Amino acid sequence: MIKNLLNKRKYITVSSVELNDTELNEDEKPNIPSGMWSKCEKCAKILYTEDLRENFNVCPNCGHHFKLGAYERIKYLTDENTFVEFDKKMVGRNPLDFNGYEEKIKGYQKKSHVIEGVVTGEAYIAQRKVVLCVMDSNFMMGSMGTAVGEKITRAIEYATKNRLPLIIFTCSGGARMQEGIYSLMQMAKVSGAIYRHGRENLLYITVLTNPTTGGVTASFAMEGDIILSEPGCLVGFAGRRVIEGTINEKLPDDFQTAEFLLEKGFIDKIVQRKDLKQVITSLLRMHEVDYE
């Protein structure tokens, strides 16, 4: 009996207290500015946004490369205050009268702070003059419409005329469906301009970023003299499920990744974002030619 008494469980009752926001004055509430913290898409770690920016928008915990806007990427890559933009106000039209397309473009312009899906211009990298085209996935997933194709083509023609090396950062979901065949023809137009640039023995470097797919992959993304890529990028033409459904086979887990393409010889080197400027500088130095 005594043993049973000693082993008997005892409970304590705690009265519940209801908490709500009205118990705190507005001045007492924590004030956390919007955008102060960022969550890594890969490891789910919460990161201080300012620290993330100082680390080239790469997660210090798992190495995941966050999405970069065109102007951010240009800032990381080029010598300070040397970038001069081309065709800044060029915007795509609506050749097929696609319902709601103009409103969609205006919405993305406001959200992404870029006018179109690519930013082009000339700049200096380690005191070497280059022509840059940087696609921005924040604007309609970097899709290639008539304005994107025209801006890239004009930039390439400028590089050819002035005998400058060309660097294109690709990031795209492919051709822009709202512009139909006008969008698809940009593949041939840009490729033709690249051919003429190469015919002058001028250097063309492509840097694949996440994601690079569709018509961009099928044209100028894979036409570089040297093809670099950031780690872990999705690079391909058709989607994984489409391919598996067509061939009735299971694809490898790493299919359509930069690492898979490097192993198969489709790209030349995978480069960490923090090392890109150094690697590109070395390539420019190795290919320097005095044309005078």
From Swiss-Prot:
Which residue intervals define the domain CoA carboxyltransferase N-terminal in the entry?
36-292
Q: Give the cofactors, semicolon-separated.
A: Zn(2+)
- Signal peptide positions on this chain: none
Cofactor annotation remark: Binds 1 zinc ion per subunit.
Taxonomy, superkingdom: Bacteria
Q: Which keywords does the record carry?
A: ATP-binding, Cytoplasm, Fatty acid biosynthesis, Fatty acid metabolism, Lipid biosynthesis, Lipid metabolism, Metal-binding, Nucleotide-binding, Transferase, Zinc, Zinc-finger
GO molecular function annotation? acetyl-CoA carboxylase activity; ATP binding; carboxyl- or carbamoyltransferase activity; zinc ion binding
Kindly tell me the pathway this chain contributes to.
Lipid metabolism; malonyl-CoA biosynthesis; malonyl-CoA from acetyl-CoA: step 1/1
Please verify whether the record's keywords include Cytoplasm: yes
Q: A single GO CC term, please?
A: acetyl-CoA carboxylase complex
* EC id: 2.1.3.15
* Catalytic function, reaction form: N(6)-carboxybiotinyl-L-lysyl-[protein] + acetyl-CoA = N(6)-biotinyl-L-lysyl-[protein] + malonyl-CoA
The entry's Zn(2+)-binding residues are: 40, 43, 59, 62
Q: How does it assemble?
A: Acetyl-CoA carboxylase is a heterohexamer composed of biotin carboxyl carrier protein (AccB), biotin carboxylase (AccC) and two subunits each of ACCase subunit alpha (AccA) and ACCase subunit beta (AccD).
The family classification in the record reads: Belongs to the AccD/PCCB family.
Explain the purpose of this protein: Component of the acetyl coenzyme A carboxylase (ACC) complex. Biotin carboxylase (BC) catalyzes the carboxylation of biotin on its carrier protein (BCCP) and then the CO(2) group is transferred by the transcarboxylase to acetyl-CoA to form malonyl-CoA.
The entry's protein name is Acetyl-coenzyme A carboxylase carboxyl transferase subunit beta
| Species of provenance | Clostridium perfringens (strain ATCC 13124 / DSM 756 / JCM 1290 / NCIMB 6125 / NCTC 8237 / Type A)
**Which gene specifies this protein's sequence?**
accD
